[in-house]
Protein backbone atom coordinates (compact mmCIF):
# COMPACT_ATOMS: atom_id res chain seq x y z
CA UNK A 1 0.00 0.00 0.00
CA UNK A 2 1.32 3.44 -0.85
CA UNK A 3 1.97 6.04 1.80
CA UNK A 4 0.03 9.30 1.61
CA UNK A 5 2.57 11.50 3.40
CA UNK A 6 6.09 10.02 3.66
CA UNK A 7 7.51 13.19 5.27
CA UNK A 8 4.96 13.04 8.10
CA UNK A 9 5.83 9.34 8.55
CA UNK A 10 9.55 10.25 8.72
CA UNK A 11 8.92 12.95 11.34
CA UNK A 12 6.61 10.71 13.37
CA UNK A 13 9.17 7.88 13.47
CA UNK A 14 11.84 10.36 14.61
CA UNK A 15 9.52 11.81 17.26
CA UNK A 16 8.55 8.36 18.59
CA UNK A 17 12.14 7.06 18.68
CA UNK A 18 13.29 10.27 20.35
CA UNK A 19 10.64 10.09 23.07
CA UNK A 20 11.50 6.42 23.70
CA UNK A 21 15.24 7.29 23.92
CA UNK A 22 16.21 4.97 21.05
CA UNK A 23 19.75 5.37 19.73
CA UNK A 24 18.74 4.99 16.10
CA UNK A 25 15.67 4.64 13.92
CA UNK A 26 15.34 2.81 10.58
CA UNK A 27 12.93 3.97 7.90
CA UNK A 28 12.36 3.66 4.15
CA UNK A 29 14.85 5.65 2.08
CA UNK A 30 14.11 8.48 -0.33
CA UNK A 31 16.24 11.39 -1.53
CA UNK A 32 13.90 13.88 0.15
CA UNK A 33 14.19 12.10 3.53
CA UNK A 34 17.97 11.92 3.15
CA UNK A 35 18.07 15.68 2.44
CA UNK A 36 15.94 16.37 5.54
CA UNK A 37 18.30 14.15 7.58
CA UNK A 38 21.27 16.12 6.19
CA UNK A 39 19.69 19.40 7.35
CA UNK A 40 18.98 17.92 10.80
CA UNK A 41 22.60 16.73 11.05
CA UNK A 42 23.99 20.10 9.94
CA UNK A 43 21.80 21.93 12.47
CA UNK A 44 22.88 19.56 15.28
CA UNK A 45 19.58 17.77 15.92
CA UNK A 46 20.86 14.27 15.01
CA UNK A 47 24.35 12.83 15.27
CA UNK A 48 24.49 11.02 11.91
CA UNK A 49 22.57 9.12 9.25
CA UNK A 50 23.44 6.45 6.72
CA UNK A 51 21.86 4.53 3.84
CA UNK A 52 21.73 0.73 3.98
CA UNK A 53 20.61 -1.83 1.42
CA UNK A 54 17.63 -3.76 2.75
CA UNK A 55 15.95 -6.86 1.36
CA UNK A 56 13.60 -4.63 -0.61
CA UNK A 57 14.90 -1.19 -1.60
CA UNK A 58 17.06 0.93 0.69
CA UNK A 59 16.76 1.97 4.31
CA UNK A 60 17.74 5.22 5.97
CA UNK A 61 19.20 4.76 9.46
CA UNK A 62 19.16 7.94 11.57
CA UNK A 63 21.27 8.07 14.74
CA UNK A 64 19.61 10.27 17.34
CA UNK A 65 21.55 12.68 19.52
CA UNK A 66 21.20 13.10 23.27
CA UNK A 67 23.00 15.27 25.83
CA UNK A 68 25.31 13.97 28.58
CA UNK A 69 22.43 13.24 30.94
CA UNK A 70 20.17 11.88 28.15
CA UNK A 71 18.38 15.18 27.44
CA UNK A 72 16.89 15.20 23.96
CA UNK A 73 18.36 17.33 21.18
CA UNK A 74 14.98 17.41 19.42
CA UNK A 75 12.35 19.01 21.65
CA UNK A 76 9.67 18.98 18.96
CA UNK A 77 8.87 18.28 15.32
CA UNK A 78 5.84 19.56 13.43
CA UNK A 79 4.70 18.92 9.87
CA UNK A 80 3.47 22.20 8.37
CA UNK A 81 2.59 21.68 4.70
CA UNK A 82 0.41 18.60 4.26
CA UNK A 83 -1.00 16.87 1.15
CA UNK A 84 -4.45 18.31 1.90
CA UNK A 85 -3.24 21.82 2.73
CA UNK A 86 0.00 23.06 1.20
CA UNK A 87 1.72 25.98 2.93
CA UNK A 88 4.01 28.30 0.96
CA UNK A 89 6.05 31.29 2.08
CA UNK A 90 7.57 34.15 0.10
CA UNK A 91 11.20 35.06 0.65
CA UNK A 92 10.06 38.19 2.48
CA UNK A 93 7.68 36.28 4.76
CA UNK A 94 9.65 33.18 5.84
CA UNK A 95 8.62 31.70 9.21
CA UNK A 96 10.84 31.86 12.29
CA UNK A 97 10.60 28.96 14.72
CA UNK A 98 10.73 29.98 18.40
CA UNK A 99 12.22 33.35 17.50
CA UNK A 100 15.13 31.74 15.64
CA UNK A 101 15.93 29.00 18.16
CA UNK A 102 14.30 26.33 15.99
CA UNK A 103 14.54 25.70 12.29
CA UNK A 104 11.99 25.64 9.45
CA UNK A 105 12.73 23.22 6.59
CA UNK A 106 11.70 24.76 3.27
CA UNK A 107 11.56 23.12 -0.16
CA UNK A 108 12.77 25.70 -2.69
CA UNK A 109 13.83 25.75 -6.31
CA UNK A 110 17.40 25.56 -4.94
CA UNK A 111 16.64 22.35 -3.02
CA UNK A 112 15.84 21.88 0.66
CA UNK A 113 16.99 24.81 2.78
CA UNK A 114 16.56 26.06 6.32
CA UNK A 115 14.66 29.30 6.90
CA UNK A 116 17.94 31.18 7.45
CA UNK A 117 19.53 29.83 4.25
CA UNK A 118 16.40 30.65 2.21
CA UNK A 119 16.32 34.20 3.60
CA UNK A 120 20.01 34.65 2.82
CA UNK A 121 19.47 33.44 -0.78
CA UNK A 122 16.23 35.40 -1.15
CA UNK A 123 14.06 32.42 -2.13
CA UNK A 124 10.73 31.18 -0.84
CA UNK A 125 9.01 27.84 -1.16
CA UNK A 126 6.93 25.17 0.53
CA UNK A 127 7.31 25.06 4.33
CA UNK A 128 7.72 21.33 5.05
CA UNK A 129 8.34 21.20 8.80
CA UNK A 130 9.39 22.97 11.98
CA UNK A 131 12.08 21.49 14.26
CA UNK A 132 12.99 22.86 17.67
UniProtKB/Swiss-Prot annotation:
InterPro entries: Ribosomal_uS8 (IPR000630), Ribosomal_uS8_CS (IPR047863), Ribosomal_uS8_sf (IPR035987). It comes from the Bacteria. One of its GO terms (molecular function) is structural constituent of ribosome. GO terms for cellular component: ribonucleoprotein complex; ribosome. One of its GO terms (biological process) is translation. Keywords: Ribonucleoprotein, Ribosomal protein, RNA-binding, rRNA-binding. PROSITE patterns: RIBOSOMAL_S8. Disulfide bonds: none annotated. One of the primary rRNA binding proteins, it binds directly to 16S rRNA central domain where it helps coordinate assembly of the platform of the 30S subunit. Belongs to the universal ribosomal protein uS8 family. Part of the 30S ribosomal subunit. Contacts proteins S5 and S12. This is Small ribosomal subunit protein uS8. It comes from Mycolicibacterium smegmatis (strain ATCC 700084 / mc(2)155) (Mycobacterium smegmatis). The gene is rpsH.
Amino acid sequence: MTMTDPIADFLTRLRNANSAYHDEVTLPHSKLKANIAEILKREGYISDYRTEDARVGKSLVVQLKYGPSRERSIAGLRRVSKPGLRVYAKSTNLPRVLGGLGVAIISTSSGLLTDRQAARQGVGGEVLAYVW
